């Protein structure tokens, strides 16, 4: 049995992530999905909480054909211990999928088999672009699985993102 690990911030989870996970699912028996930077939320580039992101991923993958685990993973201060940190918080895994150069480097140095996951139409499916659309009031729902849009709407995530993205430079005491 082969169990893989794939990590992302999922701010928000989108069809690019969905395509990569579907491809990984064709190659392995189980998948551990790490919610990276789990401690971050309520910021312009990280507006959603770990719990909200877990729900997005869980709901989007309801029909995934393989067993999967969704695990929040907080950042650590030192990259040299990050892999150990990940391993201590997840079920054991045999292979890592990533396209992030730092993640690839750290896991290879730790002796893991690493496979690069191709980006899926990155210019269209990127968290940065989706958040920009949300802030600007443009259509974004077609870039994420329907269950993800439903989760974001359930806690008024677009309003939160707009609020945390507003500059306070005009504020004075």
From Swiss-Prot:
Gene Ontology BP annotations: NAD biosynthetic process
Compartments where found: Cytoplasm
Reactions mediated catalytically: beta-nicotinamide D-ribonucleotide + ATP + H(+) = diphosphate + NAD(+)
Source species, domain of life: Archaea
GO molecular function: ATP binding; nicotinamide-nucleotide adenylyltransferase activity
Biological or metabolic pathway of the protein: Cofactor biosynthesis; NAD(+) biosynthesis; NAD(+) from nicotinamide D-ribonucleotide: step 1/1
Transmembrane region(s): none
EC number: 2.7.7.1
Entry protein name: Nicotinamide-nucleotide adenylyltransferase
Lineage, highest ranks first: Archaea, Methanobacteriati, Methanobacteriota, Stenosarchaea group, Methanomicrobia
């Amino acid at each position: 049995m082969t169990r893989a690990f794939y990590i992302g911030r999922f701010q928000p989870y989108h069809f690019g992530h969905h395509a990569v996970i579907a491809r990984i699912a064709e190659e392995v028996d189980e998948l551990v999905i790490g919610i990276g930077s789990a401690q971050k939320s309520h910021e312009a580039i990280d507006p959603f909480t770990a719990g909200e992101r877990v729900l997005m991923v869980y709901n989007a993958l309801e029909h995934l054909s393989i067993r999967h685990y969704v695990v929040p993973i907080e950042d650590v201060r030192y990259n040299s211990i990050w892999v150990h940190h990940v391993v201590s918080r997840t079920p054991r895994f045999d292979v890592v999928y990533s396209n992030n150069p730092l993640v690839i480097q750290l896991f290879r140095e730790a002796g893991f088999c690493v496979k690069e996951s191709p980006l899926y139409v990155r210019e269209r499916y990127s968290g940065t672009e989706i958040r920009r659309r949300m802030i600007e009031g443009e259509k974004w729902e077609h870039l994420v699985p329907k269950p993800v849009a439903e989760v974001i709407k359930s806690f008024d995530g677009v309003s939160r993102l707009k609020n945390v993205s507003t500059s306070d430079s005009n504020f004075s005491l």
